[in-house]
Amino acid sequence: NKITMQTYEEHGHLSDTFRYVVADLCHEEYTAFSNRRKRNLYGNKGAFSYYNPGTEYEYSNKIVYVVPNVNGRFLLVQAFRCGEKWHLVDIVYRQTASMEEIKSSIKKHEASLYIVECSNVYFPMVRELRCSLPEVKVAKEYPDVDKRIAATSDFIKEYFLLSEKKLEDSDEYGSFLASLLDYNIDSENKEANITLSGLAYYIIKYCS
């Protein structure tokens, strides 16, 4: 502007207008999303802490917790114990019903104990895994997952640490966390919470 001597982006007005249009169109969706997160068990800012994967840690226990099928998704959480905390080292969160893919993924994740929460349909798979893995246990499917999720949420916030690097590098790790944060008692998307609460329930009961 020759009068004010201010400079402007060439298409600044258009981009500003576009932002206003997007904000107006997406306002209701964002409000619903925001309110859903606020009501979530983990909705508070800073609910989760992180560990530094670049640091060498001495782990006293290594667990892989598996739920082979929740709403058509296969979930796996690899958690290593460091002192009183548990590092969520890796996560599998994918849409698959392939038994071979599930078995292969489980075998690729190191642990001293593998826990499979499943119905009896998956017992043959568990028996097969026992032939090649150190220790494989079966956990029965929990009848009231919402109660378990609520009962373990404080423990999860206090003792489970996330990997910031994994969040950046792994789409599945990020999708798992998004599912975790989107949970409420009426939602259909409970896969991540079912799996993490199952792991927490086992740790509280047998590893505390």
For the regions a language model picked out, list residue spans one by one.
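Conserved phosphate-binding/catalytic loops in two-lobed NTP-binding clefts
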Residues: 134-148
